[in-house]
């Protein structure tokens, strides 16, 4: 009988440990999801800024002088 009680107690401890682990993993997942959403927002903002940059086309006949360090 004591063996069964010890087994039950051990199982209860394992379940409690697993519940704690699941809770910690859930918190980490929520934090990562928030970070991912922020990074997606920031990336979208950067993409929009890059699209706004006026890049001259390669069709220009002007030859740019070399940079001063040459």
UniProtKB/Swiss-Prot annotation:
Superkingdom to which the source organism belongs: Bacteria
Alphabetical list of InterPro entries matching this protein: SlyX
Pfam families for this protein: SlyX
HAMAP family with a match to the protein in the record: SlyX
Family: Belongs to the SlyX family.
Protein name: Protein SlyX homolog
């Amino acid at each position: 009988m004591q063996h069964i009680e010890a087994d039950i107690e051990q199982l209860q401890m394992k379940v409690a440990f697993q519940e704690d682990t699941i809770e910690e993993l859930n918190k980490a997942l929520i934090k990562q999801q928030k970070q991912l959403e922020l990074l997606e927002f920031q990336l979208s903002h950067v993409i929009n800024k890059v699209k706004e940059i006026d890049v001259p086309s390669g069709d220009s006949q002007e030859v740019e002088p070399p940079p001063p360090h040459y």
